């Protein structure tokens, strides 16, 4: 599977400007790419004022993603602020080339920023089937909770989209590698750049690790599109040879 990671600065609470920047990046991606991954809250930055910028699932950004996915024959994923029945969600949407959508609502809301006070938490993770791959998409703070991401579904690829600040970037790098190793899964992390309106600095470090924790794409610190191709056959062969997942402890989340 050929995957493109888009790492960019985000304009605070300005969906139109962010869509324009992202679309320019997408238009420069060569054909034959299977999946494009955007950061967390890619239209707004990590704002705790959702009432200013929230959209619906029939809103402009969703329609824009569907139009691009169809035109480019590529899947696109990332999270944005969605409002439903008066509740706000930090929602990852996975738009297929057909325009069909699957979604995941962030389970672990970032209490340090007060996200839990304004957003509604998701209840379960989602595994998406796409081109013969099983993909588990998660959002930012979810990365710190390995029990939630435990690979009981035999997924092939973990995706984390984030607004992860410079002050804790070492944790981002370390935990992405750990999630790859413990779940024997390719793991992608896509983060943003720039400074937000809370004066938090972001230095990117978007990256890809393989199922043994080895770097496929090293942490990146510049604006751009970073592309790699993942090999499912090698993943399967390694899992057969090193079948660590069969020895994991069995338990359920309450």
Model-derived segments and their meaning:
Residues 55, 83-153, 167-174, 237-244, ...:
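Active-site catalytic loop in hydrolytic enzyme cores
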Residues 1-5:
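Extreme N-terminal starter segment of soluble prokaryotic enzymes
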Residues 7-13:
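Short polar catalytic/cofactor-binding loops
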Residues 78-80, 91-94, 126, 189, ...:
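Short beta-strand scaffold segments in enzyme catalytic cores
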Residues 60-74, 144-225:
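CN hydrolase (nitrilase-like) catalytic-core segments centered on the catalytic cysteine
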Residues 202-254:
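Long hydrophobic alpha-helical segments typical of transmembrane helices together
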Residues 15-16, 23-100, 165-178, 185:
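Cys-nucleophile CN-hydrolase/nitrilase-fold catalytic domain and related Cys-dependent amidase chemistry
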Residues 34-35, 135, 157:
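Structural motif
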